[in-house]
Amino acid sequence: MPGWSCLVTGAGGFLGQRIVQMLVQEKELQEVRVLYRTFSPKHKEELSKLQTKAKVTVLRGDIVDAQFLRRACQGMSVIIHTAAALDIAGFLPRQTILDVNVKGTQLLLDACVEASVPAFIYSSSTGVAGPNSYKETILNDREEEHRESTWSNPYPYSKRMAEKAVLAANGSILKNGGTFHTCALRLPFIYGEESQIISTMVNRALKNNSIIKRHATFSIANPVYVGNAAWAHILAARGLRDPEKSQSIQGQFYYISDDTPHQSYDDLNYTLSKEWGFCLDSSWSLPLPLLYWLAFLLETVSFLLRPFYNYRPPFNRFMVTILNSVFTISYKKAQRDLGYEPLVSWEEAKQKTSEWIGTLVEQHRETLDTKSQ
């Protein structure tokens, strides 16, 4: 495989940053373009730490800017598209989520065809497959089952529509006469150092006597460590560029997980943070069916008030369902086609994440000390 180049969208995000860190170590990589919507001093510092012979080009722009995307794609061999509006709680406007996740993805696909980029990898979500009900029990789901989410909520709907567009684009004829090859990686909840979701959980718990509020007691899931999620993207990029492997990858979607034990999200939060004195809230909580119907009531109130007032419920039925369902996946297809094996073991992932949580605890203590002086 000759020298190549890659564009990573969402490069400033939790997953995107880790992909870039791994990508620059790839052999014969000549250039990596990193697309940011906003480029902070922290992002600049992270890029300065990269040790690579490849040229690193920073691009600041919007995923819904067609002209910008066409310029960004010129001369690229591979696109890794991680940029997305992630919102399961319903706080972002529906149109914003659809614009970023659906329109942005389609504009990027169009730019690839125009710029004759031969390979495209999409960071999808297990949410495109479900769960559709908290009453469902889905264990070790496989791609062959072809499950599909029926939710109309903007996040799962938009990711499903975007994935369909990506896979439908496979086989398109590029402007130079070549063929466009695409695939999608369906990711569950991603944990690890720098996770904004875990950071928020920790900071809230620190303000609550180190007690972690329960939100997902009834779930059984298999989250994936960020390093392993990123590694799957690197393997997909290799595979689509390899004439021998590409044939079996083109137009396919893959579940990506690792050896993290199947557990509830609440238990995961506790396991990762217990070394620092955190504990789970032991107080009484609403039964799941009642919580679900309360969410329905709040959604109804929001709908009725919409002509007069923009009321955003604190939770909705989709959020209650996805956080309290039994839904696990198998990554055997990724093993077979991509050669995927987790790079980081559960024990190592747990240790790395716990150590990072320790730095958050220390920062909190330093802040309290400063305020008390």
Curated annotation (Swiss-Prot):
Localization in the cell: Endoplasmic reticulum membrane; Mitochondrion membrane
Membrane topology: Single-pass membrane protein
Tissue: Expressed predominantly in male liver.
Modified residues annotated as N6-acetyllysine in this record: K350
InterPro entries: 3Beta_OHSteriod_DH/Estase (IPR002225), Lipid_A_modif_metabolic_enz (IPR050177), NAD(P)-bd_dom_sf (IPR036291)
Cellular component terms per the entry's GO annotation: cytoplasm; endoplasmic reticulum membrane; intracellular membrane-bounded organelle; mitochondrial membrane
Protein's job: Catalyzes the conversion of dihydrotestosterone to its inactive form 5alpha-androstanediol, that does not bind androgen receptor/AR. Also converts androstanedione, a precursor of testosterone and estrone, to epiandrosterone. Does not function as an isomerase.
Protein family per UniProt: Belongs to the 3-beta-HSD family.
Name of the protein in its database record: NADPH-dependent 3-keto-steroid reductase Hsd3b5
Chain's gene name: Hsd3b5
